[in-house]
A protein has these predicted regions:
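Extracellular and secretory-pathway beta-repeat/beta-biased strand scaffolds
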Residues: 1-223
Length: 223
C-alpha cells in the first residue's frame, strides 16, 4: 500500500495475483518508492516497472508492520532493488526474485548517498525528506534506533544473477527451515561469482561495499 510522502507517489495496480508498481519519484538513475505496508502473499507477483535508464530502485516502508514476502519480486533490466523496513522482513518458502541486478533487504532506518542525502523510513519526530532525494549512488545503511528489526528466511530460495550482490542486513538474520522441522529444506541463497552479505547490526552504519562504517564500538567516521 503506497503512502503519500513523495513528490510523485507510488502507484500499485493489481491484476489478479499480480501487481505492477509505477509512479514513484525519479532522481537521475534512481527511482524511489514509499509504502505504508509492503507484503507479497503466497503465489503472487509484483513487478517494479522501471524504465531502462534506472539503475537503482529504492522502496521503503513507513508504517509499523513487518513485510511478509512469499511471492515473486520482479524488475526490468539490470536495476538493483533495495527494500527497507525497520520493523522486520519475513521471506517465506515461496519467496523468489527475478532481477537483473543486486538485491538488498534491510531493517535499517535509512539509506545514505554519496552527496550526503538520505532516504529515511521516517522515524518518530522526523519530517519527510522527499525534496532531498539523491541522484547519486547509495553508499551505506544507517541504524539509529538500537532495536533494528529481524530478517527471517523460512525455506526461501533467494538468488541474484552472476556477479551481483545478495544482501540481508538487519538486527538479526535467521535462516530457517520452511516448517520449523528437520525435514523441510533450510533457506538457500545464491550469488554465483558475486557476493552474499549476511549482516547483523543493531546500531551503526554499514557500507554497501561490505565494510563497517560506524558502530557504537568504533569512533565516528571522519568528515
Amino acid at each position: 500500500t503506497p503512502d503519500a510522502t513523495l513528490p510523485v507517489n507510488s502507484i500499485v495496480t493489481p491484476n489478479g495475483s499480480s501487481s505492477i508498481v509505477e509512479g514513484g519519484t525519479t532522481a537521475g538513475t534512481n527511482w524511489f518508492h514509499s509504502f505504508d505496508r509492503f507484503n507479497l502473499p503466497t503465489g503472487s507477483t509484483v513487478l517494479f516497472d522501471n524504465a531502462a535508464t534506472i539503475q537503482n530502485i529504492f522502496s521503503r516502508v513507513t508504517g509499523n508492520s513487518i513485510s511478509n514476502i512469499d511471492g515473486l519480486i520482479r524488475a526490468n533490466g539490470t536495476a538493483n532493488l533495495f527494500l527497507l523496513n525497520p520493523n522486520g522482513i519475513l521471506f517465506g518458502n515461496n519467496a523468489q526474485r527475478d532481477l537483473g541486478g543486486s538485491f538488498f533487504a534491510s531493517t535499517a532506518d535509512r539509506i545514505m548517498f554519496a552527496d550526503g542525502g538520505q532516504f529515511s523510513t521516517l522515524g518518530a519526530g522526523e519530517t519527510p525528506d522527499a525534496p532531498l532525494l539523491s541522484i547519486t549512488a547509495p553508499i551505506g545503511l544507517q541504524f539509529n534506533r538500537g532495536n533494528a528489526g529481524i530478517i527471517q528466511a523460512n525455506g526461501s530460495q533467494l538468488s541474484v544473477p552472476k556477479g551481483q550482490t545478495l544482501a540481508l542486513i538487519g538486527g538479526e538474520i535467521h535462516l530457517n527451515r520452511a516448517n520449523g522441522d528437520r525435514i523441510s529444506p533450510i533457506a538457500q541463497l545464491w550469488a554465483p561469482s558475486g557476493r552474499i552479505d549476511l549482516i547483523a547490526l543493531w546500531e551503526g552504519e554499514w557500507g554497501l561495499d561490505g565494510t563497517l562504517l560506524q558502530s557504537p564500538l568504533t569512533p565516528d567516521r571522519p568528515p
